[in-house]
Every structure is written in C-alpha cells, then in structure tokens.
C-alpha cells in the first residue's frame, strides 16, 4: 500500500475562491480531502492529512512536510472559480510519468461520478508545492464554487 500525503487547499485567513452565498473554497477542500483520506485509509493506505481544521499552512512548509514524511504520492484539493463547470487535475511542466498517470486516473474517476471533463492540464503558476515535492503530485480542482 502507498503513503499518500493529502493537502486541503487554503485555510485560515486564506479562503481561496468565494462563491455564491459566501461558499469558501477552503471549507470544501477540507471536506473533500477528509472524505478521500478516510476512504484511502479504509483501503489500507497510510495517509497524512495536512490539516484537519481551519488554519493556513505556508506552501513551503507543505512541500517540506510531504517530503520529510516520505510520501509516495501527493494530492492537493482545491476548487475552481470563474464561471465554469467540471473538474480538472493539474500537473507541472516536467511532471513524472507517474504524476501524469495518477492525474489521469483521478480525472477519469471524477468524470465517472458525473463531473464534466476539463482534462489534465499542465500549469506552472501558483504551483510551488507541485514543483517542490519529490514524489508524484497533482492538484485536483473539484468543480467550481461559483
């Protein structure tokens, strides 16, 4: 079984995107990440959930913590904003084949439960954690808050 490091995006004073009715990305990210962490643990994986409450962790510390913990895989949970729909997984330029395969497998699973397919995308802005972790890594953008 794998050691999987899960990061619920944003937290604390950093709400991330804010949607209709004040819905905050940080709250959804924590809820989704916690649910996935529970499922992965039940399947026999060892999981480290970066935060389990509403506080902010610096991106440099997130990458450092995942690396020091010795994770086999890193997954960050976020939400999109800007008036679209669907889910996408992000990887960085030069991502490993395993990162690409993991992102594609997650993307396929999201589409399988009803998300519109926005694909696996290469993104190099605001990706400090993905580019500074030593294990295969992806960010999941789980739909839009708005």
Question: Which residues does each predicted region cover?
Answer:
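Active-site-proximal helix/loop segments of hydrolytic enzymes
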Residues: 2-3, 27-146
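Glycine- and acidic-residue-enriched helix-capping/strand-helix junction motifs
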Residues: 16-31
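Short, surface-exposed beta-strand segments enriched in small/polar/acidic residues
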Residues: 4-17
């Amino acid at each position: 079984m794998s050691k999987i490091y899960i990061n619920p995006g944003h937290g604390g004073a950093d709400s991330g995107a804010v949607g209709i009715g004040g819905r905050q990305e940080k709250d959804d990210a924590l809820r989704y990440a916690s649910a996935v962490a529970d499922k992965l643990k039940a399947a026999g994986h060892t999981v480290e959930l970066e935060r389990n409450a509403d506080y902010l962790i610096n991106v440099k510390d997130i990458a450092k913590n995942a690396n020091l913990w010795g994770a086999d895989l890193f997954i960050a949970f976020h939400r999109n904003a800007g008036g679209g729909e669907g889910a996408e997984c992000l990887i960085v330029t030069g991502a490993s084949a395993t990162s690409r395969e993991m992102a594609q497998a997650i993307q396929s699973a999201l589409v399988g439960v009803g998300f519109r397919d926005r694909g696996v995308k290469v993104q190099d802005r605001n990706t400090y954690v993905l580019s500074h972790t030593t294990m295969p890594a992806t960010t999941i953008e789980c739909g839009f808050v708005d």
